[in-house]
Every structure is written in structure tokens, then in C-alpha cells.
């Protein structure tokens, strides 16, 4: 009997806005992979909306994750998304150190901002922590805003050429032992 594939989805659950675990879990499930959620927050709408409810799960994450450790779960992949605090990055780093093996991979979507602006929940300290987290990624999926932030580069208001984007992705890839850096939009 073939082992059930599992991916840890370390991300928020957002009610409105077509993002987060609400989008990831059905896609992963359709691929016959078990989506194992690790919630970082619950939001009524994503943070680009002018108003939203934000319930930070930082204080609950360690106990939540401990259950997975006690069950001796293993994962075929670990995927991170929206993180709501510096402490959450540390919790995620511990998760990766515990569950990462030579048979799985880590995907980090930095989820820091869009269109040249960081989300309101992001601070300089959070950006520094995200720079630490991406070192553990096999695959990074930043958008242009996040790529510039991770590289401490100015956001190109008029866009960037394919060559400039390749160069930026290459610089980010050099900062860790990873398989791939893929650029999303924004």
C-alpha cells in the first residue's frame, strides 16, 4: 500500500480574498495529497482590504505543532505562507528543523506585501526574520515587492525587465542552498 503523501500548510485562514489555506487546501487535496494545516492566524479578509479582523495564533502554534510531533508525523513537503509575528517565524524555523529531512522540501512564500508596499502587519523586524526564514527554503515564491524587500533593493515603480528579474532571483537564490526561486506577480 502506498503511503499517503502529506504537506504541512503553515499559513493563515482568510475568509474573503481568495488566498491562504482556504485556497491551498482544496488544490492540494485534489492532487490526492493530504493538507495538514498549521494555522498562523484567522482573518476575515486579507490585509490589503481597508478593514479586516485579525486573530493571531502565535500563542497557540507551539501546542498545535506539538501534537504533530507527538503523532510522529512526517511530511513530503512543508509550505509556509502568511506569518503574523516575529515569534511565528521562530516557531516555523523550529518546525522546519524538526520535520525537514533529505526526502522532503520546503516552500516559502514570504507574503510581505504587494505593489511596492509592505502589509500593515509587517515591521522591519519581521522583514529581517523573513530573510532568515528564506535561508531554509528549497523553493521561494516571492512577488516583486517581496523580492525587493528580501534583497534590500528599491522597488522598480515602472517594472523590471526579464533580465533584471533573473538577476534579482539569482541573487536571492545565492543566499541559501535552494532548488528554485520563482517570481510571482506584484
Which stretches of residues belong to each language-model region?
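Conserved N-terminal subdomain of the carbohydrate kinase-like
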Residues: 2-108, 112-120
Amino acid at each position: 500500500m502506498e503511503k499517503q503523501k502529506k504537506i504541512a500548510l503553515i499559513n493563515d485562514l482568510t475568509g474573503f480574498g481568495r488566498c491562504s489555506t482556504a485556497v491551498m487546501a482544496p488544490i492540494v487535496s485534489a492532487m490526492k495529497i493530504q493538507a495538514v494545516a498549521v494555522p498562523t492566524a484567522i482573518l476575515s479578509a486579507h490585509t490589503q482590504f481597508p478593514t479586516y479582523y485579525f486573530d493571531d495564533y502565535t500563542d497557540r502554534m507551539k501546542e498545535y505543532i506539538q501534537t504533530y510531533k507527538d503523532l510522529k508525523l512526517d511530511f513530503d513537503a512543508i509550505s509556509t505562507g502568511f506569518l503574523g509575528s516575529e515569534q511565528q517565524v521562530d516557531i516555523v524555523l523550529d518546525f522546519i528543523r524538526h520535520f525537514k529531512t533529505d526526502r522532503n522540501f520546503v516552500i516559502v512564500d514570504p507574503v510581505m506585501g504587494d505593489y511596492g508596499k509592505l502589509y500593515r502587519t509587517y515591521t522591519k523586524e519581521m522583514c529581517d526574520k523573513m530573510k532568515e526564514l528564506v535561508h531554509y527554503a528549497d523553493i521561494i515564491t516571492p512577488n516583486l515587492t517581496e523580492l525587493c524587500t528580501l534583497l534590500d533593493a528599491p522597488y522598480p515603480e515602472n517594472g523590471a525587465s526579464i533580465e533584471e528579474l533573473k538577476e534579482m532571483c539569482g541573487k536571492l537564490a545565492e543566499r541559501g542552498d535552494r532548488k528554485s526561486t520563482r517570481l510571482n506577480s506584484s
